[in-house]
Amino acid sequence: MLDEEHGGLGLEQPITTLMAIYEVLGQYGAPTYVLYLLTGYNTIVREGTQEQIDACLKYLGTGEQVVNSACTEPGAGSDVSGLVTTYKRENGKIYLNGTKTFITSSKGVKYLIIMCRDADNPDVISEFFVDMSKPGISLSPL
């Protein structure tokens, strides 16, 4: 849940509140992207750069799906112990290499938070904020 600084309520027990929100949204058949937005925004506000925060929060309240998380992979499902997508740091840049699948409600999102392993140290798992308009990214409907 967002803090007051970013337009939220600044709740003391955001997880309890989030669970209640999910339950009510589910009862009314809310679109799934709403559920992904709630947690995605929280991750971005907590871990993102100011530029990333601003890029996402400008869409807050528009109803547009802006961000989603991608950890599910072919052959591994959502079990992160089976992640094979990797990242490598070279010449001041970070390169991601791998395939994600079944990323629910992600068609048309502007940004994905992609989970992957360090190619040089596979015990390290990180998440990266990826602008989906950048070259080298391809999407395929299932």
Where would I find each of the regions flagged by the language model?
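Internal helix-loop-helix
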Residues: 1-63, 105-108
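Buried hydrophobic positions in well-ordered alpha/beta secondary-structure cores of metabolic enzymes
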Residues: 3, 21, 49, 69, ...
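Short, solvent-exposed loop/turn elements at beta->coil junctions and helix N-caps
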Residues: 7, 71-76, 101-102, 142
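A short, Trp-centered hydrophobic/proline-enriched beta-strand micro-motif
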Residues: 63-72
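Hydrophobic, small-residue-rich alpha-helical packing segments that form membrane-like cores
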Residues: 76-79, 94
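A structural signal for short hydrophobic beta-strand segments in well-ordered beta-sheet cores
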Residues: 85-88
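A short core secondary-structure module
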Residues: 93, 97-140
